[in-house]
Amino acid sequence: EVDDTLKERSSHGSFELPIETYTDNCEIFHSLYNHWHDEMELIYIESGSGLVRLNKEILRVKAGDLIIVNRGVLHGIKTDLKNILYFRSIVFDLNFLSGPAGDLCQERVISLLMENQAEFTHIISPSDSNYENICQLFDAIHTCHKEKNPYYFVKLKALFFSFFYEMLMGNYITPADKEENKSLASIKKI
């Protein structure tokens, strides 16, 4: 369910642990409606192929692709009917990783992402550098959250920081396009 601006109304996780993991497919409903939320989302394509919308950009995706949906980005998925999409996703609030003022991780990475001054590359494919490390961490985060072993929340935070480290090392976090963000903000107000 979404509001008039297409903002998703459902919450992901809890106040204490604002993370949720999903395993989904487009078998019955051939698309995932266009929506946006304040949380980031990581989507790993298990099998199949289709299209992913990220704001005004349409990406063709296939098995093995990792899609990164930055916070506030309008997004949706549509499957190829002959090759149904199956995917896993992680939706998380960047506040989960926040640190105090002066903390280097907070100042140089998290704050920039939270304020839309930096963003993740939208898609990482098997042929891209650092792909294996990044996808192994996606899998570890998804599994850790699903299994919920004792003190899993500590491990989750460590895994997310490792994920961010690998993204930085692969140059997959870049300065944001401020003009694009302004025009999209006006679209959401309509």
Which functions belong to the PLM regions below?
Residues F120-N130, H145-I190:
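Short, Lys/Arg-enriched, Trp-marked, Pro/Gly-tolerant hinge/linker segments that flank
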